[in-house]
Amino acid sequence: MSSPASKPASLLDASLLKPAMVDSLRKLHPRDVARNPVMFVVWAGSLLTTVLVVKDLVAPRPDAAPLGFTVQVTLWLWFTVLFANFAEAVAEGRGKAQAGALRKMRKETTARRWKDGREERVPAPDLRKGDEVICEAGDLIPGDGEVVEGIASVDESAITGESAPVIRESGGDRSAVTGGTKVLSDRIRVRISANPGDSFLDRMIGLVEGAARQKTPNEVALHILLVGLTLIFLLACVTLVPLALYSGVPLSGTAVVALLVCLIPTTIGGLLSAIGIAGMDRLLRKNVLAMSGRAVEAAGDVDTLLLDKTGTITLGNRMATELLPMPGVRMEELAEAAQLASLADETPEGRSIVTLVKDTYKMRPRELQAHHATFVPFTAQTRMSGCDLVDPHPRSIRKGAVDAIVTYVRSQGGAVPDELAQASGRIGDAGGTPLAVADGARLLGIIHLKDVVKGGIKERFDRFRAMGIRTVMITGDNPRTAAAIAREAGVDDFLAEATPEAKLALIRTEQGRGKLVAMTGDGTNDAPALAQADVGVAMNTGTQAAKEAGNMVDLDSNPTKLLEVVEVGKQLLMTHGTLTTFSIANDVAKYFAILPALFMGVFPQIAPLNVMGLSSPFSAVLSAVIFNALIIILLIPLALKGVRYRPLGAEALLRRSLLLYGVGGVIVPFVGIKVIDVLLGAVGLA
């Protein structure tokens, strides 16, 4: 479920558009424009043509371009800068709206600090890292921390949007609590883990607002490319001036500026920042908090996914699927014993056994009290559970691990049939878990527990395989069981009997081969691997150590979310690539629009290059400048929403991008510039 902070604002939302328009004007300040070298060149060109307009108004020059032409070009050049600013402001505005919603979650509370064996009430902002506070039912937790004593039900809907309460307890992987969440029951003692201003909510607000956003490596590389292209075209346009003078071509300063602006990659230059901001925004709407844009980008380049079996690939609860009686044992006898041994078992496995017996063998659950039964709980030492009956005659029914039940039967003087090992082996080979059932000295049979693979997960892995991403299942199961589940789920490889050290070693091995690795984790023992992975997604329900080690936090604590994180990263990279291709392809059409129009009068030989048949040199330049500005505003929705994600390999994606955005980037300007030329002629503006 999405959190309140993650609901996206519509692009046409007035509350978003009005501030964005104001911000786009504010961003005309040289300090803001200078952060984007491409748009700074456009800004400088706009300023230069503005000076030319004022100069022509004050002292008209006989050799100057028509004043109306210079004014129109100047206005559209300023619009180009404003549209680029508007794209960035809209992307930032969505983040500011989310930050506003997050700020509303902050509540000034009084904390019950535990110090020197007694409670004292202090304002929550006065708490420091290491302080301990007491929280009881109805209290708001005053700050981020770890439960060091007690267990409680906590409402985290203010942060995660999930209405169902969660359990937080000391000493495990569910000990982390977040400031602003509410204790619903019981009493806990919390050790504060963040100073004021460094809390989870503070970090969310800072990241959402973009205050902590840094350019990703791909953005830096793309900026270098765009700056290089801009310098090349700047030098080319500067050299045109002496060539034009030598050739006797009347080339105005306005035309040179217009040519430069149309040739440099203004489309991607104007949208680049908005694309990056929107990428982090899309991830946040999936309730995943990325600590940096670098992490989002790395997710798009991931080569290997390490996925925990439980909760990610399988449902996590083993379900009883069949009963296998031993020779000489009736199915009804095994079903009755399995049911009796499970009636007081509140685990998902125990409930599934009762349900299987009821639905398949039509045996209604019986009351243990009627048999004067005593429930025998499961322990790590015995590895079995069951019940002892008194009426109508004494019985000791047990179910549990096969080797534990075998030991129990033999201790009662019973014999173990050879068929037991064969049946257990078949279940293990199929990826299941066998539970043996005994009635005193008689071994009755086996219950087949199966870890159910999530629906649709295999198709999802097929999509990643098509993109060249390798999937590895991480499990504590034995190799035989792990291999069976891996086959059923469709993963490429598995790591059985996994330990934290084995996970870390696997990540380092993959990285040693030049691969980028992504994984999820929630426990303190996952922290080293999360820190080592290129993309480490920590669960919000996990420990503070895990959340600090990872570079993303999943507020929903859903391990499957890693797959969506990778898709968002891929979409971000695809959007960068496709719009860059489109922008550079645009320049080709604008080249054919402006250059022939400027020089065709002196050099008739280049007339065939005027493939658009534009009506006049002034109309050609003005049409290209108008198209150059309008295409930015038209592409803002695509920059914010992202290019549609398709699970294809790198070569297939490249071919598709070149065909759709490369060829399309050439054709669209030809059509657009010609249409604008016709319209300008129709209204008498050129």
Curated annotation (Swiss-Prot):
Q: Which SUPFAM superfamilies match?
A: Calcium ATPase, transduction domain A, Calcium ATPase, transmembrane domain M, HAD-like
Pfam families registered for this protein in UniProt: E1-E2_ATPase (PF00122), Hydrolase (PF00702)
GO terms for molecular function, please? ATP binding; ATP hydrolysis activity; magnesium ion binding; P-type potassium transmembrane transporter activity
Task: Name the domain of life.
Answer: Bacteria
Enzyme active site: D308
What segments bear the compositional bias annotation Basic and acidic residues?
107-123
Which parts of the sequence are annotated with region: Disordered?
101-123
Transmembrane spans: 38-58, 64-84, 224-244, 257-277, 592-612, 620-640, 666-686
tRNA processing as a keyword of this entry, yes or no, is no
Give me the residues that bind ATP, please. D345, E349, F378, T379, A380, Q381, T382, R383, M384, S385, K399
This protein's membrane topology, according to the annotation, is:
Multi-pass membrane protein
The residues that the entry says bind Mg(2+) are: D522, D526
Keywords of this entry: ATP-binding, Cell membrane, Ion transport, Magnesium, Membrane, Metal-binding, Nucleotide-binding, Phosphoprotein, Potassium, Potassium transport, Translocase, Transmembrane, Transmembrane helix, Transport
Which residues, by range, are in coiled-coil regions? none
Which Enzyme Commission number(s) are on file for it? Answer: 7.2.2.6
Q: What class of enzyme is it?
A: translocase
Q: Where in the cell is it found?
A: Cell membrane
Tell me, what does this protein do in biology? Part of the high-affinity ATP-driven potassium transport (or Kdp) system, which catalyzes the hydrolysis of ATP coupled with the electrogenic transport of potassium into the cytoplasm. This subunit is responsible for energy coupling to the transport system and for the release of the potassium ions to the cytoplasm.
Quaternary structure annotation from Swiss-Prot or TrEMBL: The system is composed of three essential subunits: KdpA, KdpB and KdpC.
Recorded hits in PANTHER family, A to Z, give: POTASSIUM-TRANSPORTING ATPASE ATP-BINDING SUBUNIT (PTHR43743:SF1)
Protein family: Belongs to the cation transport ATPase (P-type) (TC 3.A.3) family. Type IA subfamily.
Can you name this protein?
A: Potassium-transporting ATPase ATP-binding subunit
Q: Which organism is it from?
A: Myxococcus xanthus
**Which gene is annotated as encoding this protein in its UniProt record?**
kdpB
